[in-house]
């Protein structure tokens, strides 16, 4: 039986970087790690709740966190930052307030920076969110996957692989559908493979979306 390994962890330190950048004493490590997860979840949930609609999606590629003694610096890499900074920046200010209220008062200063992703649909998280939004709006599976591959190809990628599992198009029996375009060398460590999993909440149940994107090779 084949054993599957997460392609991000497999390449960590080679073509993939850590999302959290800090050092902590052993007694504080677990608390800081949980706090990082809370920060990321708070940001993602805020974007989905306030910025996502039938015509657009949040477009978060990743959240990176750096800690110093009296400073927590958060970088939100987002494909469509205009959705967050419109209305004179009220969206970003409200987000900062929500994150600040969730943190420990002794953590010090909080700084949130918004970084625009140059090619949004070259990021698997953004592309998976697009697919989920289309499937939740009852767009056919074939049309959705075809459009997603077209958007990814516009980002100058070398290959993409998509897996969608569940009750596709409302069928009674769950199944798995695959789509692949170009090269996706999962066994090559020097190949820069980005990967994500994203659930889509449809009226027929939850669909699981997995995407692998091959960007370049070192």
Curated annotation (Swiss-Prot):
It comes from Cycas taitungensis. GO terms for molecular function: rRNA binding; structural constituent of ribosome. GO terms for cellular component: chloroplast; cytosolic small ribosomal subunit. The keyword rRNA-binding applies. PROSITE patterns: KH_TYPE_2, RIBOSOMAL_S3. It comes from the Eukaryota. InterPro entries: KH_dom-like_a/b (IPR015946), KH_dom_type_2 (IPR004044), KH_sf_prok-type (IPR009019), Ribosomal_S3_C_sf (IPR036419), Ribosomal_uS3_bac-typ (IPR005704), Ribosomal_uS3_C (IPR001351), Ribosomal_uS3_CS (IPR018280). It holds the Pfam family Ribosomal_S3_C. Its main location: plastid. One of its GO terms (biological process) is translation. The gene is rps3. Residues 47-118 form the KH type-2 domain. Keywords: Chloroplast, Plastid, Ribonucleoprotein, Ribosomal protein, RNA-binding, rRNA-binding. This is Small ribosomal subunit protein uS3c. It is found in: Plastid, Chloroplast. Part of the 30S ribosomal subunit. Disulfide bonds: none annotated. SUPFAM superfamilies: Prokaryotic type KH domain (KH-domain type II), Ribosomal protein S3 C-terminal domain. Belongs to the universal ribosomal protein uS3 family.
